[in-house]
Amino acid sequence: MITNEFDTITAIATPLGEGAIGIVRISGSKALAIIKKIFKGKNLDDVPSHTINYGHIVENGAIIDEVMVSVMRAPKTFTREDVIEINTHGGVAVTNEILQLVLRSGARMADPGEFTKRAFLNGRVDLAQAEAVMDLIRAKTDKAMAVAVQQLDGSLSNLINNTRQEILNTLAQVEVNIDYPEYDDVEEMTTALMREKTQEFETLLTNLLKTARRGKILREGLSTAIIGRPNVGKSSLLNNLLREEKAIVTDIEGTTRDVIEEYVNIKGVPLKLIDTAGIRETDDLVEKIGVERSKKALEEADLVLLVLNSAEKLTDQDRTLLEISQNSNRLILLNKTDLPEQIETDQLPEDCIKISVIKNQNIDVIEERINKLFFDNAAIVEKDATYLSNARHISLIEKALKSLQAVNDGLELGMPVDLLQVDMTRTWEILGEITGDAAPDELITQLFSQFCLGK
């Protein structure tokens, strides 16, 4: 469907359901005219911008709800258009009724993410900042929120824009040397100077790329597979980490017949905990499917928590699990330390963590070891640092580095500086896709379609 970018749009901006407040948002040139048709209270033409005004929403003289209406005039709004927010009593019926009234009064239903898209199109935010809005909404921990806020505040955008400007200056210098070789007041872009500039850009982007692992973990969570043979305490460990009972815990082997996924906040790091079915040979078809899914989860995990029974000697199944997980980021947990120890610790390859999920012992040690393994006990989010957390951004930085490598390769082959402009220009264009300066319309539409309705 083709829609007019300048239509006045509306949507419910709060989750549907029972609650104290529901918000119907309107943005566009007709926002004030629409609210005046349905609002009984102060004359909204006379109220200052960025004020909240008491009154009623009415239709044909009948009161629909008692409301507070926020009036925010362009250009000092999120969309840089006139914005009205109707604060209703929360509830499905009343909020939907007011939304339908706004639609009948001349607004169009907003597409998902269209408010933020307008903020981008009107220059209020760039594409990286717009994506940070969604990251902020989806953040599962305070550290993930901090990274999203940094990006929303422009830390990544400023770094990218400054780098693009330096690349542009380099390209301009090459052009001047070509077109006006007689100018003595412009430094000549020699091979040595081009190499120096290229290495400078490579170093900056390489250092930025080094933050991707940490940033991506904070944004998407640390995929953590809990593995072990049946009935060693995997589900109990999951419940202990979650601080609530999510998995069924029994003495019957094979109780967990599928893969259970839950998120938990470990010192600011979101862990996507995957409680796998015990990996063993089985004739039970349903359990067999669960075992296969467990093996797949193990292959894809960022972290493996291997649970062994310290009250029993190592079994063939234990040894198989030790072998198939040896190339993973792994912590070995010896459970049931409240019972006499039987396991052969001298045959285990790493320092193990002795725990008792029944008595909730040493769960905090697991959390500390995870922090050490992935963050070297450093501050998880450093003040004033810039982090890459978005897979799209990471891919573009990698592409930009490949273009810079092509410039270096050309320099090594003795190619003239002016012939290397193509790859340097490509680097500039690729970085522009991060902020949206050089992003195709199809990409922009696709990105905003992933946003919430009303955002």
Curated annotation (Swiss-Prot):
Q: Name one GO biological process term.
A: tRNA wobble uridine modification
Kindly state one GO CC term assigned in the UniProt record. Answer: cytosol
Q: Where in the cell is it found?
A: Cytoplasm
> What EC identifiers does the entry list?
3.6.-.-
Q: What InterPro entries is this protein classified in? A: G_TrmE, GTP-bd, GTP-bd_TrmE_N, GTPase_MnmE, MnmE_dom2, MnmE_helical, P-loop_NTPase, Small_GTP-bd
Q: Which GO terms describe its molecular function?
A: GTP binding; GTPase activity; metal ion binding
What positions does the domain TrmE-type G occupy? 221-375
Residues at which GTP binds: 231-236, 250-256, 275-278
Cofactor comment:
Binds 1 potassium ion per subunit.
**What is the similarity comment for this entry?**
Belongs to the TRAFAC class TrmE-Era-EngA-EngB-Septin-like GTPase superfamily. TrmE GTPase family.
Entry function: Exhibits a very high intrinsic GTPase hydrolysis rate. Involved in the addition of a carboxymethylaminomethyl (cmnm) group at the wobble position (U34) of certain tRNAs, forming tRNA-cmnm(5)s(2)U34.
Subunit field text = Homodimer. Heterotetramer of two MnmE and two MnmG subunits.
Q: What is this protein called?
A: tRNA modification GTPase MnmE
Q: What is the lineage of its organism?
A: Bacteria, Bacillati, Bacillota, Bacilli, Lactobacillales
